[in-house]
UniProtKB/Swiss-Prot annotation:
CDD domains, per the entry: HNHc
Protein name per Swiss-Prot or TrEMBL: Uncharacterized protein MT1183
GO molecular function (one): nucleic acid binding
Species name: Mycobacterium tuberculosis (strain CDC 1551 / Oshkosh)
Entry similarity comment: Belongs to the Rv1128c/1148c/1588c/1702c/1945/3466 family.
Length: 454
């Protein structure tokens, strides 16, 4: 495998940048409709080829760079440096693993795992969505299918993809799967591998989508719970006292105008609310497992606005007031910008300090990290071994991986505003922000307003 010099690599990227800049400056008024479509097709080819060019870089990083050099996992490093989502970073890493060249333990080069697919991408004949369909096919294909058949199937799908849209390729891949593996994957191991539930991002109206695949055991469990709690008349939020333990009478059933989907939702809420109130979940990161919400005294008194949970979600004040009647949740109030001056001489933060950090930081304070407070630990900005105090004004939240970065060259400090600054080691410092504003979008917007001329 040929190795290029730093100068050759830099020169090639400079030429690529210059060529693209020339294309960006083109004025296409003189082109006819067929010519415009032809130009778009040529640009699409180059867009696809660029993805292939990234594979070698990503695979080399995966093979040679440790987390200390990267400042975290490869997924996190790519997301932060390239300003892409962690999900997109994972997709690129997985694509590079499947389509990029590999090396054996002895150092000799090996072809890509999906050889035909990699070649088609390199020629610009297939794009990201085609590759996604082919990867999904092999993710579902049983390991019992021998190597020769797998290679032939991959070559056929890659060839089919070069002349079809991804959505058309999907139907062909489904038919091929039926021929190669007609009985499907019904083993316990396959079901365990596929299980999962995903809660989507919170939308503008506060609602969140949920999706996933349930094992037969979980489905059977949910069926039993819903048979009771999602029955007509049960757990009806419109009732003054919703029925949970008792069986709804005819009048309760008649009053219930909810759909089955709405009754399912309310049943899950009642079941999880009861579990939280039971106290049987023990503790999580120094606090009883419960809902922690932060808001301002002004918003609470006005019964308007939104609180922010330890998980990073937004809760309307009307919901927050109603939630307070069901369980012993924690509510952290701010009458001003700074939390209470809580401190003590023990190394571990007290429950009260944790609550205030949940409210103040809302999540990991390292720039670029989106871990919410529920998934973060208390970090001493000034090492405890130096001060022997655990002062609320010298504490912050950091997720586990970021907390450990302080042992690998990172430093933390408080600025004049009480915000935590993260200072990377020199080899990772590319001028990135020192403060994490991800959990405080309102501050970002206010800072932009302040920067604009008046």
């Amino acid at each position: 495998m040929r190795s290029d010099t730093r100068e050759e690599i830099s020169a090639a990227l400079d030429a690529y940048h210059a060529s693209l800049s020339r294309v960006l400056d083109l004025k296409c008024d003189a082109l006819t409709t067929p010519e415009l479509l032809a130009c778009l097709q040529r640009l699409e080819v180059e867009r696809r080829r660029q993805g292939a060019a990234e594979h070698a870089l990503i695979n080399q990083l995966a093979g040679q760079a440790c987390e200390e050099e990267l400042g975290g996992t490869l997924r996190t490093a790519l997301a932060n440096r390239l300003h892409i989502t962690p999900g997109e970073a994972s997709r690129r890493i997985a694509e590079a693993e499947d389509l990029g060249e590999r090396r054996a333990l002895t150092g000799e080069p090996l072809p890509a795992q999906l050889t035909a697919t990699a070649a088609a991408q390199r020629e610009g004949k297939i794009g990201r969505e085609h590759i996604k369909e082919i990867q999904a096919f092999f993710k579902e294909l049983s390991a019992a299918v021998d190597l020769g058949i797998r290679e032939a199937a991959e070559a056929q799908l890659a060839e089919l993809a070069t002349s079809r849209r991804p959505d058309h390729l999907h139907g062909l891949a489904t038919q091929l799967m039926d021929w190669l593996h007609p009985d499907g994957n019904f083993s316990d191991q396959e079901r365990a591998r596929k299980r999962g539930i995903t809660m989507g991002k919170q939308e503008f109206d506060g609602m969140s989508r949920i999706s996933g695949l349930l094992t037969p055991e979980l489905r059977a469990t949910i069926e039993a719970v819903l048979a009771k709690l999602a029955a007509p008349g049960a757990c009806n939020p419109d009732d003054q006292t919703p029925l949970v333990a008792d069986t709804p009478d005819a009048d309760a059933v008649r009053r219930d105008t909810r759909s089955q989907a709405q009754r399912n939702h309310d049943a899950f809420l009642a079941a999880l609310r009861g579990l939280l109130a039971s106290g049987e979940l023990g503790q999580h990161k120094g606090l009883p497992v419960t809902i922690v919400v932060s808001t301002t005294l002004k918003e609470l008194e006005a019964a308007t606005g939104k609180g922010v949970t330890g998980g990073g979600s937004r809760v309307p004040m009307s919901d927050l007031i109603r939630m307070a009647s069901h369980a012993n949740h924690y509510l952290a109030l701010f009458d001003g910008a700074k939390p209470l001056a809580l401190y003590h001489t023990k190394r571990l933060a007290s429950p009260a300090q944790r609550i205030m950090l949940y409210a103040k930081d809302r999540g990991c304070s390292r720039p670029g990290c989106d871990a919410p407070a529920y998934h973060s630990e208390v970090h001493h900005v000034t090492p405890w071994t130096t001060t022997h105090r655990t002062d609320i004004n010298d504490l912050t939240l950091a997720c586990g991986p970021d907390n450990r970065l302080v042992e690998k060259g990172w430093k933390t400090r408080k600025n004049a505003h009480g915000d935590t600054e993260w200072l990377p080691p020199p080899h990772l410092d590319h001028g990135q922000p020192r403060i994490n504003r991800y959990h405080h979008p309102a501050k970002i917007l206010c800072e932009q307003d302040d920067d604009e001329p008046h």
